[in-house]
Amino acid sequence: IKPVYVLDELFQAKLIIEAVIEDLKIKQELFCRLESVLEADSILSTNTSSLDLNKIGTNLKRPERFLGMHFFNPVPVMALVEIIHTAETDPSVTEFVFQLAKKWGKVPVHVRNSPGFIVNRAARPFYLEALRILTDGATDAATCDAIFRDCGGFRMGPFELMDLIGLDVNYEVTTQVWESFDRHPRFEPS
């Protein structure tokens, strides 16, 4: 791994893991630019938290070499990485990235491209109910976190985790999942 300061310097990279802002247009533009400078056998991956990979990769010339690698914060500590494939992702690309993640000491899981993937889809009600508990005045954020952490065995409570992730990112992910499920009330941002 080495830093570069101009995209053209990536021309020999075999694997790109993109981690820019959760903005579909920005990701689409970046991947098109990357594809234009990379060799044909390079693998493009996105660390998106919830954006539809089919939409991100819609303009790619080589969609079979595109997939998701969703890491969790803090990345050096958290072992899980979701390996997300689309209908167009070459299975050998998916398997290569899966095995590479294992070599890095991660615990990869195969995931089909779907709203929020596994963790962010399952986590939405966790965060949303915590926010509703706070809004309803049932308890304060610190007490809620302490209950989950000290009594429930969680490493962090819901508010601590939202703070680590960033409220802006958490809200955007919740909105994307909610929109993907036709604004189903169980995913409605609060």
Predicted features, each with a name:
Residues 1-190:
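N-terminal glycine-rich phosphate-binding loop for ADP-containing cofactors
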